[in-house]
UniProtKB/Swiss-Prot annotation:
One record GO biological process: translation
Protein name: Peptide deformylase
UniProt-listed CDD domains: Pep_deformylase
Summary of the function given for this chain in its UniProt record: Removes the formyl group from the N-terminal Met of newly synthesized proteins. Requires at least a dipeptide for an efficient rate of reaction. N-terminal L-methionine is a prerequisite for activity but the enzyme has broad specificity at other positions.
InterPro entries reported for this sequence: Peptide_deformylase, Peptide_deformylase_sf
Keywords linked to the UniProt accession: Hydrolase, Iron, Metal-binding, Protein biosynthesis
Signal peptide region: none
Cofactor needs: Fe(2+)
Origin species: Streptococcus thermophilus (strain ATCC BAA-250 / LMG 18311)
Disulfide bonds: none
Enzyme Commission number, as recorded: 3.5.1.88
Keyword Metal-binding recorded: yes
Catalysed conversion reaction: N-terminal N-formyl-L-methionyl-[peptide] + H2O = N-terminal L-methionyl-[peptide] + formate
């Protein structure tokens, strides 16, 4: 049984055992485009990926299932070499600890996502990046575009174009990298991991 057939079964919930780790060749392969119109199998896969993110952000479910919290997941991380990503970025509480008016700043399953335009300015997260497929800390600034325009198809097969900046931009670029065989630490300066080039925006 291949990975996708296993994962899309009605009884299956994605957990950490489904996520492959660095060293697996699928993480270094360029994934295939998803065919349109979308198959039921690919739609279900996307929905299962999104459900994993929801579960991973729920403290009770995450503890019960032994999940690491995540804001993004790409199909290649499940050993499925297809250009499918899910992103679920929660909005923070305000300064007084009140919940946000909108729960998520970005909530989408993207098929065949690609960066079609980007800023000259670059950005990096101040605390670096992590990855569900990497079981170690890799310190350093992961240099990416500060702003991007993304084209993708949603699960209804509609073509969408969105502009992203800040943390949302970083998350989507990280996941698209997975569909191109790129790991986040490939973008860290090997000689000086915390070097700051002119104009680099540090996102805290």
């Amino acid at each position: 049984m291949d990975a996708q057939t296993k994962i899309i079964r009605a009884s299956h919930m994605i957990d950490m055992n489904d996520i492959i780790r660095e060293g697996n060749p699928t993480l270094r392969a360029v994934a295939e485009d998803v065919t349109l119109p979308l198959s039921d199998e690919d739609i279900i896969l996307g929905e299962k990926m999104m459900q994993f993110l929801r579960n991973s952000q729920d403290p009770v479910i995450a503890e019960k299932m032994g999940l690491r919290g995540g804001v993004g997941l790409a199909a290649p991380q499940l050993d499925i070499s297809k250009r499918i990503i899910a992103v679920l970025v929660p909005n923070p509480e305000d300064a007084k600890g009140n919940p946000p008016k909108e729960a998520y700043s970005l909530q989408e399953i993207m098929y065949n996502p690609k960066v079609v335009a980007h800023s000259v300015q670059e950005a990096a997260l101040g605390n670096g990046e992590g990855c569900l497929s990497v079981d170690r800390d890799v310190p350093g600034y992961v240099v990416r575009h500060a702003r991007v325009t993304i084209e993708y198809f949603n699960k209804e097969g509609e073509k969408k174009r969105i502009k992203l900046r800040g943390y949302d931009s970083i998350v989507v670029q990280h996941e698209i990298d997975h569909t191109n065989g790129i790991m986040f630490y490939d973008r860290i300066n090997k000689d000086n991991p915390f070097t700051i080039k002119d104009g680099l925006l540090i996102i805290e």
